Curated annotation (Swiss-Prot):
This protein's encoding gene: DEFB1
Family to which this protein belongs: Belongs to the beta-defensin family.
Species per Swiss-Prot/TrEMBL record: Hylobates lar
Protein name: Beta-defensin 1
One MF annotation (Gene Ontology) recorded for this entry: CCR6 chemokine receptor binding
Lineage, highest ranks first: Eukaryota, Metazoa, Chordata, Craniata, Vertebrata
GO biological process: calcium-mediated signaling; defense response to Gram-negative bacterium; defense response to Gram-positive bacterium; innate immune response in mucosa; positive regulation of flagellated sperm motility involved in capacitation
Described function: Has bactericidal activity. May act as a ligand for C-C chemokine receptor CCR6. Positively regulates the sperm motility and bactericidal activity in a CCR6-dependent manner. Binds to CCR6 and triggers Ca2+ mobilization in the sperm which is important for its motility.
GO cellular component: extracellular space; membrane; microvesicle; sperm midpiece
Amino acid sequence: MRTSYLLLFTLCLLLSEMASGDNFLTGLGHRSDHYNCVRSGGQCLYSACPIYTKIQGTCYQGKAKCCK
């Protein structure tokens, strides 16, 4: 009986984490914006882009800029 309560508690914790929006099933097949930036030859910066580079997108869920 104690084992079933432990399993139920674990399942509830897992489902509550998944309800936050960024769960495992919606994340399948999606790459992070940081990965896409670096793969395309850019770099993620929190400050302004250096001279002779342009903003190509965002990184870290919109908190930084992808400079290329």
